[in-house]
Design a protein with these regions (language model features):
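N-terminal winged-helix
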Residues: 2-43
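Short, well-ordered beta-strand segments
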Residues: 2-7, 52, 86, 110, ...
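Secondary-structure junction motif
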Residues: 12-15, 61, 97, 101-130
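Beta->alpha turn/N-cap motifs
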Residues: 36-37, 53-60, 88-89, 140, ...
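Short hydrophobic/charged patches on amphipathic alpha-helices used for structural packing
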Residues: 41, 45, 75, 101, ...
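Pocket-flanking alpha-helical
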Residues: 41-44, 48-66
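Hydrophobic hinge/microswitch elements
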Residues: 45-50, 114-169
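Flexible hinge/capping segments at coil-to-helix
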Residues: 67-109
């Protein structure tokens, strides 16, 4: 059995899909856990997962590196990325090339709940310390995407979008 724990990223799910396809065996057992930041670390530490995928920034790196060391978990950087606004194609700002935080102020920022470890150091999104006028937290990616459409919400992310998994909306 091979298991991966990850924060809520479609690029990580896509990579998992590619691994399963590449194995090409008649029988196998895999597990994927899309979960909160602390749970990703716990799952790797307890060997529930062989691999964990997390977002590190200059802001949270020292705290998370300390946790990795305390939990005897090794961090390997996969890539670096910029920050992008993620919103649905029908959003009033969707046609803009660039969007400022001030322009986003009247729309709800959508973020992933981190449970008992709801420190901004555990946030999956960049700018977790910014004072948002409207903030909604959700537990899963499907709910976040529904809120994005239903409330013209947005989130801040890496910009790595997998259309074949997310769709084009």
């Amino acid at each position: 059995k091979f298991s991966v724990s990850m924060q809520h990223y479609t690029f990580a799910v896509k990579a998992f899909v590619e691994v399963v396809k590449a194995v090409g065996m008649d029988e196998y057992e895999f597990a994927v856990h899309e979960t909160q930041t602390n749970q990703v670390i716990e799952n790797v530490r307890n060997m529930k997962s062989e691999l964990g995928i997390l977002f590190l920034s200059k802001f949270n790196e020292a705290v998370l590196q300390k946790l990795f060391k305390e939990n005897d978990v090794i961090f390997e950087e996969l890539f670096t990325c910029d920050t992008y606004v993620y919103l649905w194609k029908g959003h009033p700002l969707a046609d803009k090339e660039e969007i400022t935080l001030e322009e986003l102020r009247e729309y709800p920022c959508l973020s992933f709940e981190q449970g008992g470890y709801n420190s901004f150091y555990f946030a999956e999104e960049v700018l977790s310390t910014y004072e948002y006028k409207r903030l909604i937290k959700a537990d899963d990616r499907a709910t976040l995407l529904n809120l994005m459409v239903g409330l013209n919400g947005y989130t801040l992310c890496s910009g790595i979008i997998c259309e074949e998994l997310n769709g084009s909306d």
